[in-house]
Amino acid sequence: MGVHELTHPLVRHKIGLMREADISTKKFRELAAELARLLAYEACGDFPLEVRTITGWDGNPVEIEQIKGKKVTVVPILRAGIGMLDGVLDMIPNAKVSVVGLARNEETLEAHTYLEKFVDKLDERLAVILDPMLATGGSMEATISMLKRNGCRQIRVLALVAAPEGLARVTAAHPDVDIYVAAIDRCLNEHGYILPGLGDAGDKIFGTK
């Protein structure tokens, strides 16, 4: 368990492109989806496999490996987490989708919940939470707590950028949760934004200001 920062050159390159001040909505979305795929690839690296026998192209039996009985629910935190959803579903197409809506109070920097919609049988599923920016950690801590209250015991987090302060908060509250992140940045500013960060990921994904 712990924090896993991806160091692959493709990840470093793509997260760097996302930091451009004048990046277009289209490009930001594309890069968010690409990085989500790479994060999902890394987060699924320990999935167990089983051998199955199928009929090959020539009519003869072929032994293949498939992921063994892993039930997954992907949990985007609204609204920015939606920008990572398609990329993760490209890699885990059979996953079911749960949704959590959280809004941050800009004065206290704490999150409050306005939507909670989980799939069934959470106690049998691995939940993969999506949030581009793990800043103060308040939204992530709250989402993990919600999942656990609803019976989920296997949880992983995918984030594009994280602040050390947010990582410290989440790992202290939930040391049993693995966090996969494309970049760990320097710090938070006085408004709770990550530096150097990406800016407001939700605005950049949805083209709003």
Curated annotation (Swiss-Prot):
Keyword DNA-binding: no
Cross-referenced InterPro entries: PRibTrfase_dom, PRTase-like, Upp_B, UPRTase/APRTase, Ura_phspho_trans
GO terms of molecular function: GTP binding; magnesium ion binding; uracil phosphoribosyltransferase activity
NAD is among the record's keywords: no
Listed NCBIfam families: PRK00129.1, upp
Cofactor requirement: Mg(2+)
Role summary: Catalyzes the conversion of uracil and 5-phospho-alpha-D-ribose 1-diphosphate (PRPP) to UMP and diphosphate.
Activity control summary: Allosterically activated by GTP.
Gene Ontology BP annotations: UMP salvage; uracil salvage
Cofactor note: Binds 1 Mg(2+) ion per subunit. The magnesium is bound as Mg-PRPP.
Known catalytic reactions: UMP + diphosphate = 5-phospho-alpha-D-ribose 1-diphosphate + uracil
SUPFAM superfamilies: PRTase-like
Residues that coordinate or bind 5-phospho-alpha-D-ribose 1-diphosphate: 79, 104, 131-139, 200
Residues bound to uracil: 194, 199-201
Transmembrane segments: none
Family named by the database record: Belongs to the UPRTase family.
EC number: 2.4.2.9
Gene3D superfamilies: 3.40.50.2020
Keywords: Allosteric enzyme, Glycosyltransferase, GTP-binding, Magnesium, Nucleotide-binding, Transferase
Pathway per the UniProt entry: Pyrimidine metabolism; UMP biosynthesis via salvage pathway; UMP from uracil: step 1/1
Protein name per its UniProtKB record: Uracil phosphoribosyltransferase
